[in-house]
Amino acid sequence: MESLRIYNTLARDKQVFVPRQPGEVRMYVCGITVYDYCHVGHARMLVVFDLVQRWLRAIGYRVTYVRNITDIDDKIIRRAVENGETIKSLTDRFIGAMHEDETALGIQRPDVEPRATQFIPQMLGMIETLETNGYAYQAADGDVNYSVRKFADYGKLSGKSLDDLRAGERVAANDAKQDPLDFVLWKRAKADEPEGASWASKYGMGRPGWHIECSAMGCSLLGNHFDIHGGGQDLQFPHHENEIAQSEGATGETFVNYWMHNGFVQVDNEKMSKSLGNFFTIREVLERYDAEVVRFFIVRTHYRSPLNYSDVHLDDARASLTRLYTALKDVEPDTLALDWNEPHAQRFAAAMNDDFNTPVAVATLFELAGEVNRTRDASLARQLKQLAGLLGLLGREPRAFLQQASGAAQAGGLAADEIEAQIAARVAAKQAKDYAEADRIRAELLEAGIALEDKPGGSTEWRRV
């Protein structure tokens, strides 16, 4: 099997993956700020790094996968006040909702899922170390800030030069800062903030800045220097740039070897945003589409490419996934173990080892499905299920998927008992030699998105199309 190569944002190139400890991978991914339901952009991040950790395990690595939860933040505080509920009540509720969405999408839980509020002492310890090392200062307004010009390598991840960054582009001007580009490590508490929004510290009551949360949790759980750090493309700057400055400023060690960033989600070729009114939660999408269809829709696009969300693309994903399940419908796979020397498995592995190239891996699944359709071979069916399983796909009994309503069928299609009643009426028409009526029922069902297949012995099976 070829070596795994990962596109490293830091190097701006694909690099052969060499873990710090042979056979072990330590990976941290920036998770979700829990003040609302997860949206399609979150779904992409969750699925992408689920695929990454699945593949790392599949090729034999012992993986420690950490994905954090931000459960203290200005948006969280505002939403809790608006709702008249405590911060903990709000965050617990949306953490539960996030877990429900993950389960629906077939996402395996990370090995460790730390909440920011569980690591306040570690954050304060890192801030104090940064102050001792000359990277942090307490401003006149009580906030503790990071002095970006003290860190010589600032900009190495994003490629941005401090001299080219203008105050006000991404940070608001603040007279208390020594430099407008400095960012907050510890926010001084305000008098009108609710209970649970601040902690005691040598700097006074306050709460951590967003960036220090991930540095402290990553270093605490995975060590000062670990293998992979991931997140959405929008986090590359300033969040991940600031994480590097904090962590390396505090420890004097390289923070992360490989930086991975998944691409944006677009809606009809425009960036998804609430202001454009093209913003969809995972729950809204799952009301209309089967969760495995949504997962497949995400999987079949390379993780670094833009993902264009539209009903047309989801309908196409459903049709494509239906083709894969249909290939398995009448073939019982054998029970042998996956053999990486099999040609299809080799092509699949080569694709996944080429920076997790899921479009090519999925193409291999369709090659297999075509061969299964032609040969009805049990070993090929087994390979199809096994390789798809590494992507979190084709885990259901084929007929259960094929007869399940989703998309347009879910919104207004026939229920299973209605379909069975129509099939019974068609059987009765055929027995009465009223073939015109039998054909009419078949055509009517097909127009409603139901395909019939007459089997030897007189039975009829159906599936949604």
Swiss-Prot record:
ATP-binding among keywords: yes
Keywords (A to Z) from UniProt: Aminoacyl-tRNA synthetase, ATP-binding, Cytoplasm, Ligase, Metal-binding, Nucleotide-binding, Protein biosynthesis, Zinc
Cross-referenced CDD domains: Anticodon_Ia_Cys, CysRS_core
Residues annotated to bind ATP: 274
GO annotation terms (biological process): cysteinyl-tRNA aminoacylation
Location of the motif 'HIGH' region: 32-42
E.C. numbers: 6.1.1.16
Recorded GO CC terms: cytosol
Compartments it resides in: Cytoplasm
Leading EC class: ligase
NCBIfam families according to UniProt: cysS
HAMAP family: Cys_tRNA_synth
UniProt-recorded name of the protein: Cysteine--tRNA ligase
